[in-house]
Amino acid sequence: MNRDEVQLLGFEIVAYAGDARSKLLEALNAAKDSEFDKAEQLVEEANECIANAHKAQTNLLAQEAKGEDIAYSITMIHGQDHLMTTLLLKDLMKHLIELYKKGS
């Protein structure tokens, strides 16, 4: 996998993870306003974005597992960072939304 291909996967991960992050934060605002159905829908949409980011990540890992040399890319590192922080945010959102539900 050449550097351009790795960089493209990095951009793909950044885009999907960024969309998921935005949806999760929007879900938190919906829960804050007691719009729990909307919050749950947004979390589901975020999960789809995360799944797409994970597919791109898995593609890269599979290539490396096959013994293919993977070019170094700051964009890919940035994408991995975005994905991991979004996964952490998703875990926190579950708990925060539940707290809003208990408080209403």
Swiss-Prot record:
Its cofactor is Mg(2+). It is found in: Cytoplasm. The modification Phosphohistidine is found at H78. Induction: Induced by lactose, galactose and galactose-6-P. Repressed by glucose. PANTHER family: PHOSPHOTRANSFERASE SYSTEM SUGAR-SPECIFIC EII COMPONENT (PTHR34382:SF9), PTS SYSTEM N,N'-DIACETYLCHITOBIOSE-SPECIFIC EIIA COMPONENT (PTHR34382). One of its GO terms (molecular function) is metal ion binding. Residues 1-102 form the PTS EIIA type-3 domain. Mg(2+) binds at D81. GO terms for cellular component: cytoplasm. The active site is at H78. This is PTS system lactose-specific EIIA component. It comes from the Bacteria. Homotrimer. Gene3D superfamilies: Phosphotransferase system, lactose/cellobiose-type IIA subunit. The phosphoenolpyruvate-dependent sugar phosphotransferase system (sugar PTS), a major carbohydrate active transport system, catalyzes the phosphorylation of incoming sugar substrates concomitantly with their translocation across the cell membrane. The enzyme II LacEF PTS system is involved in lactose transport. It holds the Pfam family PTS_IIA. The PTS EIIA type-3 domain is phosphorylated by phospho-HPr on a histidyl residue. Then, it transfers the phosphoryl group to the PTS EIIB type-3 domain. The lineage of its organism: Bacteria, Bacillati, Bacillota, Bacilli, Bacillales. Keywords: Cytoplasm, Magnesium, Metal-binding, Phosphoprotein, Phosphotransferase system, Sugar transport, Transferase, Transport.
